[in-house]
Amino acid sequence: MAGKAHRLSAEERDQLLPNLRAVGWNELEGRDAIFKQFHFKDFNRAFGFMTRVALQAEKLDHHPEWFNVYNKVHITLSTHECAGLSERDINLASFIEQVAVSMT
């Protein structure tokens, strides 16, 4: 990805986070990151979702922290480069939402 990531300012957070909060993303307590848990009909759909997200994450060179058990996928996003939330996390979370909606 071009350019160094910067940690979102309070003003940027106020502008960028409400749409994600509205669909269930939460800020983690004690860490500058966002988190959401997704539920799918079965393991195949959960794995298909993860595959689509993984392909986009690789293109963006920005990878989620995630955990999968059967039909549940837990995702945490934070940018290591700036030790906190960046626009990269917001963009990836928005893409993840689009994929999740298309898989339900």
From Swiss-Prot:
Source organism: Rattus norvegicus
Stated name of the protein: Pterin-4-alpha-carbinolamine dehydratase
Catalytic activity: (4aS,6R)-4a-hydroxy-L-erythro-5,6,7,8-tetrahydrobiopterin = (6R)-L-erythro-6,7-dihydrobiopterin + H2O
Record-listed substrate binding positions: 61-63, 78-81
Keyword Methyltransferase: no
Highest taxon in the source lineage: Eukaryota
Gene Ontology CC, one term: nucleus
InterPro entries: PCD_sf, Pterin_deHydtase
Gene Ontology biological process terms in this record: L-phenylalanine metabolic process; positive regulation of DNA-templated transcription; regulation of protein binding; tetrahydrobiopterin biosynthetic process
Molecular function via GO: 4-alpha-hydroxytetrahydrobiopterin dehydratase activity; identical protein binding; phenylalanine 4-monooxygenase activity; transcription coactivator activity
Biological role: Involved in tetrahydrobiopterin biosynthesis. Seems to both prevent the formation of 7-pterins and accelerate the formation of quinonoid-BH2. Coactivator for HNF1A-dependent transcription. Regulates the dimerization of homeodomain protein HNF1A and enhances its transcriptional activity. Also acts as a coactivator for HNF1B-dependent transcription.
Annotated family: Belongs to the pterin-4-alpha-carbinolamine dehydratase family.
Residue intervals passing through the bilayer: none
Enzyme class: lyase
Keywords: Acetylation, Activator, Cytoplasm, Lyase, Nucleus, Tetrahydrobiopterin biosynthesis, Transcription, Transcription regulation
EC number(s) given by UniProt: 4.2.1.96
Compartments, as annotated in UniProt: Cytoplasm; Nucleus
Modified residues (N-acetylalanine): 2
Name of a matching Pfam family: Pterin_4a
Subunit structure, as described in the record: Homotetramer and homodimer. Heterotetramer with HNF1A; formed by a dimer of dimers. Interacts with HNF1B (via HNF-p1 domain); the interaction increases HNF1B transactivation activity.
